[in-house]
């Protein structure tokens, strides 16, 4: 048996061996014997630890109060709950009071990593949950990656958690090729869980809610990842989640038409890599933030969405910027913050009469595995700026291993000008990955000439330098393509790598800035040029 196999009020030598539960190395004494707390009332040391040399006999030899028993029970449990799970089990071996709080541990994150296990996880999880008192359980997270587990066990664990009144429940099932996916027991969640669960995360299983299960009165966050659920099943489920505020769907391949019913509390929606999705139709009146990652879809919003992020780097088509300019406005006319990430633009952004009347923040990123198409005219981005009379911040980011556009260097023809436009509210402009492409130089010159309220202009000739004092923009999710062509996430404090022609192009960009831009910057505008540092070089990444 293990520590979690102990019955209430009894601590045997086997029960006190955390190493047997977590397969740890020898543990040091947490406290000297004089500071150990006594066994529970009515139990003697001989009754608790009958075997000579047991860990309990060594650690709990004092009948004096000591330090731990002087603390109120709720404080002692709070201290115990703050420990990592392995350390919490060790502490339970050294103290009867911690053993009692172990059986009421509020936050159970059960995985190979959390428990420090290399071997069997299923039996350990089963012991922990079967012997939990059912009191105080607030969070249960089961990460069962790579483990063969019978659905009987998972059903039992969910039943235990729901009966205990768990508030946060996360079930991540293993993906085993050739094996039928786990069918999540939805009915168990409505056996009391509808009145306690506030957060639900389900991954790698089928989720088939049926009509008549009931209403989820407490659920505020729902995350479904790699879940098999049909359109009507999801719509029916959401109709019963009256308190939901945050909804995320990832890799849900059965969803074709995502219908969001009238959910007054829903403010955040993220949809990622749902490969068959074609339409998102939302009636949620207070939806304010929408994030789309993957392919393009038709968007119909019945609310004033303020924040939109569209990223199609993975498995997405090109021309996302064009899509945002031509089609997004009809679905979200009141957007105030727009972030667009595109793998490439093959067609220039068209000039249209439609307006983003409330847009204040615009961040456009072109992150290509190859060169950005030379057919794309960077100056056409004026279409976005012109359509946004309230725009205050514009960030344009270009990442490409090579530059194929016509360079301004060696080109004797005059720069194009668009005299009919003025941008009265634009205050801050940042261009990352600035190069010598003539149309990009023309865009920078246009902004200098037409942005009458411009306060700061930053031209970063690196791919996003992160050296102290040289950071052009903070962006939590940064992606880049490696030399082998794989898309990789960059650590937030690292410079994105540059190599070969990219480094050479940064020198040409600096020359273009000196010749065509620097001397045009009006007095009073803060003008900053950021060049690659030693950390931007690929070998140092």
Where does each model-flagged region fall?
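Leucine-rich repeat
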Residues: 4-9, 14-20, 26-29, 36, 74, 82, 90, 102-105, 115-126, 131-137, 160-168, ...
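Conserved hydrophobic beta-strand positions in leucine-rich repeat
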Residues: 108-111, 138-143, 167-172, 198-202, ...
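Short amphipathic alpha-helices and their capping/turn residues within compact interaction modules
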Residues: 84, 96-97, 103, 107, ...
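Extended repeat-based solenoid scaffolds, especially LRR ectodomains
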Residues: 297-374, 387
